Amino acid sequence: MQPLQIAPCRLLYGLYRGLKSPASTGTRICPAMARPSSNMADFRKLFAKAKHIVIISGAGVSAESGVPTFRGAGGYWRKWQAQDLATPQAFARNPSLVWEFYHYRREVMLSKEPNPGHLAIAECEARLREQGRRVMVITQNIDELHRRAGTKNLLEIHGSLFKTRCTSCGIVAENYKSPICPALSGKGAPDPEAQDARIPVEKLPRCEEAGCGGLLRPHVVWFGENLDPAILEEVDKELTLCDLCLVVGTSSVVYPAAMFAPQVSARGVPVAEFNMETTPATNRFRFHFQGPCGTTLPEALAPHETGNVS
């Protein structure tokens, strides 16, 4: 399979080509604007007139469904943080351990449901489509909760827990098996005292394409890997065309996604941030609404009594 390479996008800034944390970039988001507003009525006026809305979502949206974020205090699986296991190097060293981690995450997700934030976004997209308006969701999440909520216009820039990619033939396929292979049944416990399963590589998930049988890996973007250039081209197009942008449940610290909304704001497009706390990018935006996305988004995206305000 050919390695992922960055696309030459207008808006997607050569420095931030792979999945990176702020420590690895040493970069600050550009200087601040005036203090953002929390006036919902003002936001609703802009929302009523917007024709092309981009919603950028992150882990905070799914956290309200009980999805582990593996960030901050207590953000460990066994003794590991996500960035310890979500790398090509970790998979090459110990594919059994990495597959245990992703098996655990897959099994957790099978018990979770979209929350009111996901549902508000999906309902808004469907309603605005009938009005000839467009909503595009660009998510950093790999849990498919937006898809399960009913969102149709969706770019999953970091991949999906429920897709695999063959390390031999490169085939990408949906995979909702539980467990994904017999050897992982009952494995993946997150307890720090749990013993690593040490599953032989031949017993790990394997490609089912005729004549292949190669080792499968999760079809997600790991730290140090480039994002899919075709998806980045789509992101570039959406960010260029949008006339309103929402940033929901994202910490604005993982690049390149951390640059998406500030770049939109820099060209004068209103950006509204919905988050439990401020982020390094908050003062770059027109609005900031603090609180659970499952509470703030249904209010922000609710239908107007008179439909689209002209």
Curated annotation (Swiss-Prot):
One Pfam family hit: SIR2
Positions contributing to NAD(+) binding: 58-77, 140-143, 249-251, 275-277, 293
Annotated active site: H158
Cofactor(s) required for function per UniProt: Zn(2+)
Gene3D superfamilies registered for this protein in UniProt: SIR2/SIRT2 'Small Domain, TPP-binding domain
GO cellular component terms listed in the entry, alphabetical order: cytosol; mitochondrion; nucleolus
Chain positions recorded as Zn(2+) binding sites: C166, C169, C207, C212
GO molecular function: NAD+ binding; NAD-dependent protein lysine deacetylase activity; protein-glutaryllysine deglutarylase activity; protein-malonyllysine demalonylase activity; protein-succinyllysine desuccinylase activity; zinc ion binding
Quaternary structure and interacting proteins, as annotated: Monomer. Homodimer. Interacts with CPS1. Interacts with PCCA.
Protein name: NAD-dependent protein deacylase sirtuin-5, mitochondrial
Free-text cofactor note: Binds 1 zinc ion per subunit.
Keyword entries, A-Z: Cytoplasm, Metal-binding, Mitochondrion, NAD, Nucleus, Transferase, Transit peptide, Zinc
Reaction(s) this enzyme catalyzes, per UniProt: N(6)-malonyl-L-lysyl-[protein] + NAD(+) + H2O = 2''-O-malonyl-ADP-D-ribose + nicotinamide + L-lysyl-[protein]; N(6)-succinyl-L-lysyl-[protein] + NAD(+) + H2O = 2''-O-succinyl-ADP-D-ribose + nicotinamide + L-lysyl-[protein]; N(6)-glutaryl-L-lysyl-[protein] + NAD(+) + H2O = 2''-O-glutaryl-ADP-D-ribose + nicotinamide + L-lysyl-[protein]
InterPro entries: DHS-like_NAD/FAD-binding_dom, Sirtuin, Sirtuin_cat_small_dom_sf, Sirtuin_class_III, Ssirtuin_cat_dom
Superkingdom of the organism of origin: Eukaryota
Species assigned in the record: Canis lupus familiaris (Dog)
Gene: SIRT5
Biological process terms in GO annotation: protein demalonylation; protein desuccinylation; regulation of ketone biosynthetic process
Transit peptide region: 1-36
